[in-house]
UniProtKB/Swiss-Prot annotation:
Organism of provenance: Shewanella denitrificans (strain OS217 / ATCC BAA-1090 / DSM 15013)
Pfam families, A to Z: ATP-synt (PF00231)
Highest taxon, organism lineage: Bacteria
Function description: Produces ATP from ADP in the presence of a proton gradient across the membrane. The gamma chain is believed to be important in regulating ATPase activity and the flow of protons through the CF(0) complex.
Disulfide bonds: none
GO aspect biological process, one term: proton motive force-driven plasma membrane ATP synthesis
UniProt-recorded name of the protein: ATP synthase gamma chain
Keywords assigned: ATP synthesis, Cell inner membrane, Cell membrane, CF(1), Hydrogen ion transport, Ion transport, Membrane, Transport
A GO MF label: ATP binding
Amino acid sequence: MAGAKEIKTKIASVKNTQKITSAMEMVAASKMRRAQERMAASRPYAESMRKVIGHVAQGSLEFKHPYLEVREAKRVGYIVVATDRGLCGGLNVNLFKKVTLDVKNWKAQGAEVEFCPIGARSVQFFKSFGGQVSAHASGLGDAPKLADLIGTVRVMLQAYNEGKLDRLYVVFNKFVNTMAQTPVIEQLLPLPKSADDVKTNRWDYIYEPDPKEILETLLVRYVESQVYQGVIENLASEQAARMVAMKAATDNAGDMIDGLQLVYNKARQAAITQELSEIVSGASAV
């Protein structure tokens, strides 16, 4: 059994670690609330943009934008959003498992794949994964802006425009609640039809300028807004996962301290018992 002094030093070390994890838990909780506010603020914009595009696309029968046309999938692109930092449980691992499984399915169909990782962990993973990395972004911070993503996203849009990509997906962790974050793969291009798009008896609208010009602008903004929404959702998921992970670490540190304290008490009791035995033995000898 280790001596009482060594155990006491270990207890002090674990207590210091516990203070750090507790502080990180509180910081993550604060950042998560701010990320949730940004997420809630950006969702209506993305949803409204999708509805407007659906109306314009359905009302413009004489013009079909390339982003709306389905073509044979020979080359698939993924914009994969992960975190810049670790200490967030299995958040990134679960995301990478999902996207690699989807990649495997596409490759089994004979499709080629390329990636656009966002976040330092995503960049690091896909550079070691061996796939083609066409563009990347990292270091977006806790309050990312759409302007920080536009250049990266447009590299993938340009590839789609030139026929180098036939499908484009965004992959991120969707924030469900504090305890649940789900990795999702959402199709960006060609624009998937929603249930709302296939409804009949639509009103006719007069568009100014013409539908072609509107779609040219809106579709690019739509893709950018969907990627931005994914980044915001992933950020909220990251902070929630980190808060939960740090709480678990703090609780585990508490359990470890209790265990060490018990060992320390036993060691101290053994030392006192030994000293008493030596005193009694010495007195008996006299």
